[in-house]
Amino acid sequence: LYFHTDASQGAGQIDIHPQRLGVDMMTLNAGKVYGPKQVGLLWAASSVALQPLIAGGGQERGLRSGTENVAGTVGFAKALQLAVAHQRGEFARLSRVKQAFLSTITELLVDEVMILSPRKGCLPSHVSLSIPGIDAERVLFLLEMKQMYVSTGSACAANKGTRSHVLAGIGLDDTAIAGSLRITFGRYSTEETAKRGAQLLAEVVRHEQQRQKSRKWGAQ
């Protein structure tokens, strides 16, 4: 039985050395460290007997045939090198950015917002929250109109049209899951933009609450 981890989100923020983590396989994504898009990495321990899925020219030690993206691979290596070199400072900076967002949103939506991310042991670039009773898909659309971009889940699960089994697994009901959002911060995020983002989110939530009240009054 092999243990694989997708450590893409942690690259450049925390120590993801595969041998220190004790994993058998690890994948990384160049885009997460501001490298070339559509370039990935698979690390496998020597004890893992990988079998090729693509036959042909025998590139990449016979494991994945096809012309290699040399420029993309070199770019990925450099981007990862730079991310690791600035890891400690970036972790501290993003922690301040995240705290600025959390302080602002919990002040503006003190009675509405549920912060799902743990305060400790969590990446500084991510916040998971829920506003029960609000349709997160509508919030996402309204925020896009204000040029603020968030998500309702991971990119690989966003289009499945089903509720998050992860949020259900930690005990959230359907109302809380339907109101869940994921906010991420990056290299170009600042404490000021984080505060402004929290303000925009609060404005949209207030707008939706008022819309719901108007619909209820209209129905009566």
Language-model segments: which ranges?
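Pyridoxal 5′-phosphate
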Residues: 1-220
